[in-house]
Amino acid sequence: TLLESDIDTKEDALKIANDPEARELGDAYALLARVYAGPRFTWEESNFPEDNMRTYQCLHDSIRRCSPIGTLQALRIKGSITPTVEKDMQISFDDAFRIVYDHANRGDAYCQYVIGNIFFWRDDNRIDSAEAMLTPPPMSWTKRIQKSLTANSVQDRIAALQGTVPDETLQENASNLAKEWFNKALDNGLAMFQGNLRNIYIDEADFSNARRVAKTAAELGNPAMMLYTGLDCHENGKFEDAFTWFTKGAALSQSESIAELADYYYHFYDAKNLRCTIPYDPVKAIGLYRRAATKQFSDAGYTALQAAFGYIFHIGHLPLDWGLIADLTHMAATKDRFMFALP
């Protein structure tokens, strides 16, 4: 495989960038960089080790090995495009975008996701060919005047005369392209990174599509989307379906799903249909509360206290273990549940 030291010209770099076999090591480094970048770039339940130094090393190796994916991905990982790295870039952002866009059009799910991310995060302002997709072709003065006469606001009229596109329109166009490519990636089975697509629909108050995205991704194995789908089922009184999704999420160590499943077994919710449908198992619930308490999420303190109360009140014939109770209440205190923490 060619190293960056073997690349003498831009033509050499583009030849590698356009050849999947020649750039495969660079692409592998790009994906490895994402793994090391932490849960914001993978998914929390994967438990991949977060290592900033390895992230930058892998990403820089990827860029120097002419990976279009790595080159574009660097726009998303803060601090990656240092002046030194940008100087060593073998291909431009435009070259990288063109190559990834071509593979996205051929049906590559990860490339489709990368293109969607370009428009979601508005990285098009660094990529001429992406920016061009958001703006219509130049119009003659005659057409500009005609358009200005039919504009709904003074701002739109001025923009029409200047031949520019209002920021609101650019944002709408970018959002539409992001949705298009994220949906294509989801349809092709890429489920782990669909939070951005769901968030777009939520921001647009398009809750039907937000639910569709969550359920599709959940069915494909996304733990967080299992939680969201379960919560949606719960809110709509579909307790058996919610229980199923919380169980699946908990099996993949999704923190909130573990807590919700514990609440279900504990019959925490005062809903007759839930209590008729879900078996009451306080011992299993306390075990799940203890498991959830070890996680880092907003309700971890609550789950620690629930587990402590289970032992304090002998729920399900649990032993009165003051050492364990002290550990659990201390855990609750360290996770911002000070009000009920015992001394």
Predicted region positions:
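Short coil/turn linking the two alpha-helices of tandem helical-hairpin repeats
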Residues: 4-7, 33, 37-49, 75-90, ...
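Short helix-capping/linker turns of helical repeat alpha-solenoids
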Residues: 23-26, 38-40, 44-45, 65-71, ...
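TPR/TPR-like (Sel1-like) alpha-helical repeat modules
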Residues: 56-64, 136-138, 283-293, 322-337
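Fold-core signature of tandem repeat domains
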Residues: 63, 104, 115, 186, ...
